[in-house]
C-alpha cells in the first residue's frame, strides 16, 4: 500500500473513529489472493467492547462506500482491537497498561519483565518481581531506555480487587444465613 493511500485512509477514517470515542491505532491493506483486506485496529482508554467495534465498523463501511479511497476492486473490512499481547509504542499505550506485566527490550541491550505501577511524561515506575522468593523491587525506567515493550498475558495472577470483593460477598452471604 502506498504511503499516499495510507495517509488518505487515515485522514478519512480517523475522525469517524474518534467520533465513536475510540483511537485509530493502525491501518493496513493486505492482499489475500485477488481480494484485499483493510484491517483497522481501534482502542480506547476504557477498552473497546463488541458493540463499540460494531458501531465503528458500520460507520467506516458507510464512509468507505461513499468514497473511492479503496479504489474499484473488492475488499473486506476488518475492525478489531490490538489484542492481549499488544506492543506499547505511544504514551497512551503505557497508561492503558498500568498494572499489567510488560516485557521490555532495553536500548542498552538486555530484557526486563516488570509490572507498570505509574506512568508520567518522562517514564515509568515499575515493580520488578522478586527472584527465588525475594520480595519485588521498584524501579524507574525512562522512556528513552526502552527499545520495545509488549504486554504479557497472565493466567494465574491474583486480582486483589476481585479477591476483596469475593471475601465481602462471602461474608455477606454467611451473615445472611
UniProtKB/Swiss-Prot annotation:
Start and end residues of each stretch annotated as Disordered: 153-177
Family that this chain belongs to: Belongs to the RimP family.
Localization, UniProt: Cytoplasm
HAMAP family on file: RimP
Primary localisation category: cytoplasm
Amino acid composition bias (Basic and acidic residues), ranges on this chain: 153-171
Domain of life where this protein originates: Bacteria
An example Gene Ontology biological process: translation
GO cellular component terms listed in the entry, alphabetical order: cytosol
Keywords assigned by UniProt, alphabetized: Cytoplasm, Ribosome biogenesis
Gene behind the chain: rimP
Role this protein plays: Required for maturation of 30S ribosomal subunits.
Name the record gives this protein: Ribosome maturation factor RimP
Amino acid at each position: 500500500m502506498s504511503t499516499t493511500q495510507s495517509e488518505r485512509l487515515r485522514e478519512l477514517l480517523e475522525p469517524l473513529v474518534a467520533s465513536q470515542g475510540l483511537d485509530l491505532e493502525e491501518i493496513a491493506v493486505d492482499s489475500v489472493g485477488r481480494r484485499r483486506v483493510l484491517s483497522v485496529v481501534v482502542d480506547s482508554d476504557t477498552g473497546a467492547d463488541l458493540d463499540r467495534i460494531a458501531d465503528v465498523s458500520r460507520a467506516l463501511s458507510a464512509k468507505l462506500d461513499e468514497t473511492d479511497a479503496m479504489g474499484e476492486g473488492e475488499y473486506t473490512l476488518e475492525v478489531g482491537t490490538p489484542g492481549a499481547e499488544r506492543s506499547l509504542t505511544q504514551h497512551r499505550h503505557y497508561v492503558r497498561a498500568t498494572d499489567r506485566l510488560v516485557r521490555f527490550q532495553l536500548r542498552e541491550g538486555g530484557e526486563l519483565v516488570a509490572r507498570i505501577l505509574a506512568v508520567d511524561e518522562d517514564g515509568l515506575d515499575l515493580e520488578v518481581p522478586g527472584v527465588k522468593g525475594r520480595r519485588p523491587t521498584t524501579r524507574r525506567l525512562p522512556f528513552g531506555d526502552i527499545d520495545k515493550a509488549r504486554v504479557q498475558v497472565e493466567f494465574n495472577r491474583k486480582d486483589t480487587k476481585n479477591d476483596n470483593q469475593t471475601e465481602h460477598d462471602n461474608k455477606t452471604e454467611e451473615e445472611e444465613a
